[in-house]
Regions:
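Juxtamembrane intracellular "pre-TM" segments in multi-pass secondary transporters
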Residues: 17-27, 225-270, 296
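Extracytoplasmic gate region of multi-pass secondary transporters
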Residues: 51-52, 261-316, 320, 376, ...
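Extracellular/periplasmic helix-loop-helix junction of adjacent transmembrane segments
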Residues: 52-83
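Central cavity-lining transmembrane alpha-helices of secondary-active solute carriers
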Residues: 74-89, 310-323
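Conserved MFS/SLC helix-loop-helix module at the cytosolic interface between two early adjacent transmembrane helices
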Residues: 83-122
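Cytoplasmic helix-loop-helix junction between adjacent transmembrane helices
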Residues: 127-166
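Helix-loop-helix hairpin linking two adjacent transmembrane segments in secondary transporters
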Residues: 162-224
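C-terminal transmembrane helical hairpin of 12-TM major facilitator-type secondary transporters
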Residues: 336-383
Length: 473
């Protein structure tokens, strides 16, 4: 997600829309801050990306059905996000974002490592409860900090740079999975403090512990940029009330301000929230990919991880680059809706992925799943940048938390449950292909239509904000 500070500007920014000089961090500071945020975002993605590859082994060792596996993958994660994510976002808008994020990195890293010590479904469920801190805090904090590194017209490329972390996590995890599954999956159990440590458990430990080092790096070396606001853009946010007493009531008050702002601009935000909500319901295929290929085509997780190195390390970076270039092309053409339009194009590119589960041979199925991964790289940064562009700085933590709630809770937590439920209770676990196909075929096109309906209102809102910013300069 993100971008170049003063010297990283989009080529098409005009004098009329460019932000006044001197307000933003230097290129050196912006680059280093983005580097640390990329490490943080990569770390937050590691556990999410690695669990599908470990799925067959976890299911076999703990004797889980598809539905039980989906609960472990998703619901345990979503519980923490729901309970803590919204209050944390309130804190992000008031206190040091980097300190809160460093604490969160420590919590989710130790939670990931703890997954490697569990001996039952209940223990693994509880350990993953703490891993939810990753998405609960990292997304709003990283986006909020990034938005104060560069002016609005440069946000799409800035978000594209930060997106390297979101893509880098799965890519690095795929690489780790390939070697770790090959080396450890069938090894004899080690003697652990709470019982035997099998191959999949050792991988959790190896993935989790390095996050503590990233937390220390952030805490002691990363600067936090000054917050930038547009005067009189939002009223009702108490910026001085920082004492503990009355904080809970203030949380509700401030979220009320955020919801009121969304309500006043519902033509802009309703399609954005609605489309993300609907599309997230169809993402359960991600959690079941390794199980699907293992069950239907007898491709082991190590083989799948090796093949997925191609899209994660080659196609996704290409998608990130092309997406940023497309967004800047539309910006040079004077399109105020450039970021959202780029995301829509990527969504059309990825539509064919819904048929992957129905393919009769593994190579065709894998190719279509790969198309989905490429489209995420192509349009993901623009989707996130589009939201940040129209979100007031003083509400950015709270509104980003609400927005990411749609994916982190609905997508990561409950989409796998939909797929698992269909597989176990409706079509049978021997027909997993239909359990994967049905949600993607229903929710994917529906969410795309909703996004299209919001394109014109979004463009008008960007123009309004540019006028406000020019008047405040």
């Amino acid at each position: 997600m993100t971008t170049e500070a003063a010297s990283m500007g989009a080529a098409g920014a005009t004098a009329a829309t460019a932000s006044p000089p001197g307000k933003w961090p230097s290129a050196r500071v912006a680059y280093y801050t983005l580097f640390v945020l990329i490490l943080s975002t990569t770390c937050s993605q590691l556990d999410i990306a690695i669990v599908p590859y470990l799925g067959p082994a976890i299911k076999a060792d703990l004797h889980l059905s598809d539905y039980s596996f989906s609960l472990m993958v998703g619901v345990s994660f979503g519980l923490f996000y729901t309970a803590v994510g919204i209050p944390i976002a309130w804190l992000l808008d008031r206190f040091s974002r980097k300190r809160l994020l460093a604490l969160a990195i420590t919590v989710w890293s130790l939670g990931t490592a703890a997954c490697g010590l569990t001996q039952s479904f209940a223990q693994l469920f509880i350990a993953r409860f703490f891993v939810g801190a990753g998405e609960a805090v990292n997304g709003p904090a990283a986006y909020s900090i990034t938005s104060d590194l560069v002016p609005r017209e440069r946000m799409p490329r800035a978000v594209a740079v930060l997106q390297i972390g979101s893509i880098g996590g799965p890519a690095i995890t795929t690489l780790i999975s390939f070697f770790a599954l090959t080396a450890f999956l069938h090894m004899a159990p080690l003697h652990g403090p709470f019982g035997p440590i099998r191959g999949w458990q050792l991988i959790f430990i190896l993935v989790g512990l390095p996050g503590v080092l990233i937390a220390l790096l952030m805490l002691f070396t990363m600067p936090e940029p000054k917050r930038h606001t547009i005067p009189n853009q939002v009223s009702g946010v108490d910026e001085t009330r920082r004492h503990i007493g009355g904080a809970i009531l203030q949380v509700f008050k401030d979220y009320g301000v955020a919801l009121a702002y969304i309500g006043r601009h519902w033509k802009v935000f309703a399609p954005m929230f609605g489309s993300l909500f609907i599309s997230s319901l169809g993402t359960g295929a991600i959690a079941f990919q390794a199980i699907f290929f293992d069950r239907r085509f007898h491709w082991g997780p190590a083989r799948l991880a090796g093949l997925n190195l191609i899209p994660n390390f080659i196609l996704v970076p290409i998608g990130l680059f092309i997406g940023a270039m497309v967004a800047e092309h539309f910006t040079r053409k004077g399109r105020a809706d450039a970021a959202l339009l780029t995301h829509i194009i990527a969504r059309f590119v990825g539509l064919g992925a819904m048929f992957g589960a129905l393919m009769p041979n593994p190579w065709a199925a894998w190719a279509l799943f790969t198309l989905m991964i490429f489209s995420i790289g192509l349009g993901g940064p623009s989707q996130n940048a589009a939201f940040q562009i129209v979100t007031p700085t003083e509400l950015r933590g709270k509104m980003t938390a609400l927005y990411l709630f749609m994916y982190s809770v609905v997508g990561v937590a409950f989409a796998p449950v939909i797929t698992g439920f269909i597989s176990t209770y409706l079509v049978g676990e021997g027909n997993l292909k239909m359990a994967i196909f049905l949600p993607t075929a229903i929710f994917g096109p529906t969410s795309l239509v909703i996004t299209l309906l919001g394109l014109k209102p979004y463009g008008r809102e960007v123009e309004r904000l540019k006028a406000l910013e020019a008047g405040a300069a």
